[in-house]
């Protein structure tokens, strides 16, 4: 008998016919549950049947999450593309924007798991003074299955750099061309609200006997996309008057700077809104909660990734 340890897990992404090894922290999670429909069995003539009966015919969307440290070599650039880019689709001459779909493979000490037709529903970039730059990913897929043991052959994996150089960065923020000082930390979140279309039919439900022939989700629509974040700043005599500030039309630029002062990653939110709030702590500070109101392509607003 052998056990599977999280620290030994390897994660791969398959997109466009190519597979990529993605180096993650141990913050990997994936699962899928089945939906239960209960029904009463108590009748007028038999009041003793107090416990409900049940039917299980369909699965809920699979859930996954993982954290990727970003490196100078940018071998994880496929992840950045999947976060930002949308694909235009057309149905009955109506054009819609869909998220890029991909497969995830996770190899453990005893198994190889696959999550099919994945989409990213959330990405969180969080950075502060000279900390390693990471992005936290979460999303959903249609089906989770075990496709083999630890020796399962995934085929050709895209080549990767011989080295992995972690990035220690610090945040730099400008609001309407004014540089913000005394910054503690910055976070930027990209959220995709996904609604899975109904997929249960009476005919298919009658054929379900176990998980192998259960009904799984297959199609979705993106109902809303949100780009937002928070800037945390020490309160000083230079910015004390801004603790209750707000704006509905500002140009916000968030940059992740390397130790040598060059920019590794940057996003421009223009126009955007923000509200300021004060935090009472050992050292007084204030936070700016911001959100993009710009509907242009997100990929064009990430102005630097190099």
Q: What is the predicted role of each segment?
A:
Residues 1-306:
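Signature of extracytoplasmic/envelope-associated structural regions
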């Amino acid at each position: 008998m052998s056990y599977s340890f999280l620290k030994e897990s390897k994660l791969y992404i398959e997109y466009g016919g190519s597979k990529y090894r993605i180096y993650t922290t141990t913050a990997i999670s994936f699962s899928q549950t089945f939906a239960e429909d209960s029904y009463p069995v108590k009748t007028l003539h038999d009041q003793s049947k107090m416990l409900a009966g049940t039917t299980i015919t369909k699965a809920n969307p699979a859930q996954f999450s993982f954290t990727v440290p970003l490196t100078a070599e940018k071998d994880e650039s496929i992840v950045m593309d999947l976060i930002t880019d949308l694909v235009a689709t057309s149905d009955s001459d109506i054009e819609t924007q869909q998220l890029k779909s991909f497969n995830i493979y996770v190899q453990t000490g005893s198994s190889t798991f696959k999550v099919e037709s994945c989409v990213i529903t959330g990405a969180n970039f969080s950075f502060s003074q000279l900390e390693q730059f990471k992005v936290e990913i979460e999303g959903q897929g249609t089906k989770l299955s075990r496709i083999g043991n630890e020796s399962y052959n995934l085929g050709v994996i895209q080549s990767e750099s011989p080295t992995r150089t972690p990035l220690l960065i610090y945040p730099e923020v400008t609001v309407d061309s004014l540089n913000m000082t005394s910054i503690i930390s910055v976070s930027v979140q990209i959220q995709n609200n996904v609604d899975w279309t109904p997929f249960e039919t009476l005919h298919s439900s009658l054929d379900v006997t176990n998980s192998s022939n259960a009904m799984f989700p297959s199609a979705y629509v993106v109902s809303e996309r949100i780009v937002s974040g928070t800037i945390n700043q020490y309160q000083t005599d230079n910015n004390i008057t801004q603790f209750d500030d707000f704006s509905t039309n500002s140009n916000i630029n968030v940059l992740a700077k390397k130790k040598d002062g060059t920019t590794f990653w940057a996003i421009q939110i223009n126009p955007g809104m923000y509200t300021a709030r004060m935090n009472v702590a050992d050292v007084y500070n204030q936070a700016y909660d911001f959100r993009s109101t710009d509907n242009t392509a997100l990929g064009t607003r990430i102005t630097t990734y190099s």
